[in-house]
Structures are given as C-alpha cells and as structure tokens.
Design a protein with these regions (language model features):
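Core alpha/beta nucleotide-donor-binding catalytic domains of modification enzymes
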Residues: 1-210
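Mid-to-C-terminal catalytic/tRNA-binding core of tRNA(Ile)-lysidine synthase
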Residues: 17, 253-282
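Short amphipathic alpha-helical segments
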Residues: 32-35, 225, 274, 278
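Residue-level detector of well-ordered alpha-helical segments, enriched
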Residues: 138, 223, 241, 272-276
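Hydrophobic/aromatic-lined pockets within catalytic cores
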Residues: 147, 213, 281-282
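Residues at alpha-helix boundaries and the short loops/turns that link adjacent helices
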Residues: 149, 214-218, 271
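Contiguous mid-protein beta-loop-alpha structural module that forms a pocket-lining wall or clamp
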Residues: 166-257, 264
Length: 282
C-alpha cells in the first residue's frame, strides 16, 4: 500500500519539497487509511495536519466521529483542527440537499485552513488538501455523471490533482483499503448515511454497479475506469486546442472583455466551439 500510494503521488506530482498536507479526516475507513499512510510518508517530504468537520447532523454518531478523530490524531501525533458547521441551516438557506451543503461547507473549511497554514510556511511552499477518494469512488462518479448527462469533463471522473486538492488513494480500491486497515488492526467509524437508499450515490454503489458486474460484465468497474481515463485524455486535448485557438484568434482584450472574430469561431467543430466558450468564461 505505502509504495503504491507513494509512487502514485510522485507520478502525479502531488507534493513538492517544502509542501504541507492537510488530510480531510471524517473518521471513516478511507480517510483513516489516508491519514495513516501519509503519516508514514510525511517526513521529510512534507508536514502533515488533519481537519475534521462536524456537520451538525447525525447527533451522537457525529460526536462519536469527532472523538474518534481526536483520539486517532493524538495516537499518531498529528495536529488536528475540528470545525463545526450547521449543515441543515445552510441547506435550507441555499435550497440545497444536506449532502451538497455538507460538501460545500467542508471544502470551505479545508480551503480556509490551508490558506491560514500556508501563510506560516516559507515563501514558495504550498499546503495541499488530501482527500480520500479511491478507485471505487471514481467508477461510481463516472457512472453517476453518465446517468446525469455530463460532458467529457464529468465523464473523465475524479482528477488526481485539482488545484491544491490531491487524491493519493485513487490508485487503490475499497477492498484494498479495508484489508490494509484490518491487517494493521486499525479501527474506523461507519457512517450510517452511507447505507441509506435516499442518496443516488449509495444506490449506484450498492445496487447498480453490483448488477452490472453480475448481469453484464464482471469487469464492469475496471472498464468504466479505463473509459474515464481515455475520456480524460480527450478532454485535456480539447482544452489545449481551445487554448491554442483562443491565443491565435483573440483580437481584442480589455480588463473585463476579450473577443475573437466570429469567422474564427464559426469554422471550428461543434465540440471545440463548446470548449472555446468554456475557455472564454473561465
């Protein structure tokens, strides 16, 4: 596990000398695995901290997760920041599901803590946010995006590196993570909402993917990941093409305005027109 994750991090240049890493620690198996693995890889390549977000839902179960995170970090000598959010109120105020509201608030906390820590580091050092998504999550995400009608960017799946966010466990699967924890006699918390059929992702995980494996192709998950990788390459190429076309064709640029000739835009294939528009909006 350690070598696999270390090699994957190096392949995708997730950290550089002098960088620091914040682990998003929920207390579940995936984030516990991520923290324990990175703890063993941390010195001297990067400094390590953890952040646990209490979402203000799940009552005693959430309190249990917080206490577990504190105990785990104490045992590993990893500094821990606990942040408290009231997800139901935020969800109601912004017309969001609690799942989406929790995700937004969680990332806000992580980005804030990363920014604060970065100010304490030497110039040029960055703070990365390590998230515990793994191979199974990626396959589920690709399938979910397909069923929602996503474009190539969504169908490419979860990116290993996205700004300061890194995902060192995308090279391993759920079963590998559980096996690693059990072999090391490392405990974790179970989130009861992960079993709820109310969430689409849970239904994909517990019903749709198993059905595809048994009724269509036992290698369905692997093939979904392979397709996502190919689509990701196509997406990256189209982004690059849009950037090159833009740089060649742009004819006017002001502080809040840039333009390319309509003729240059019109002669592009439809898919590149879409990518050009996205590039302009970015």
């Amino acid at each position: 596990m350690l070598k696999k994750v270390r090699d994957y991090m190096r392949e995708h240049e997730m950290t550089a000398p002098g960088d620091a890493v914040i682990v998003a620690l929920s207390g579940g198996a995936d984030s516990v695995c991520l923290l324990t693995v990175l703890k063993q890889l941390a010195t001297p390549e990067f400094l390590l901290r953890a952040v646990h977000v209490h979402h203000g839902i799940r009552g005693a179960e959430a309190d249990r997760d917080e206490a577990f995170a504190q105990k785990l970090c104490e045992s590993l000598s990893v500094p821990l920041c606990v942040a408290y959010c009231h997800v139901p109120a935020y969800a109601a105020e912004h017309g969001l599901s609690e799942e989406e509201a929790g995700r937004i608030l969680r990332y806000q906390v992580l980005e804030k803590e990363a920014g604060k820590w970065e100010q304490e580091l030497p110039a040029g050092s960055r703070v990365k946010i390590a998230l515990a998504h793994h191979r199974d999550d990626n396959a589920e995400t690709i399938l979910h995006h397909l069923l929602r009608g996503s474009g190539l960017t969504g169908l490419a799946g979860i990116r290993p590196v996205q700004g300061r966010r890194i995902r060192p466990l995308l090279c391993v699967g759920r079963e590998e993570i559980r096996a690693y924890l059990e072999a090391g006699h490392i405990s974790w918390c179970e989130d009861s909402t992960n079993q709820s059929p109310d969430y689409t992702r849970n239904r994909i995980r517990s019903q749709v993917l198993p059905l595809l494996k048994t009724a269509v192709n036992e290698q369905a998950e692997e093939h979904i990941l392979q397709a996502g990788q190919i689509i990701g390459q196509a997406d990256a190429y189209l982004r690059q093409q849009a950037e090159e076309i833009w740089q060649e064709a742009v004819c006017g640029r002001e502080e809040d305005l840039a333009a390319i000739p309509l003729t240059a835009f019109a002669r592009q294939p439809e898919i590149l027109k879409t990518y050009l528009i996205r590039h302009m909006l970015d």
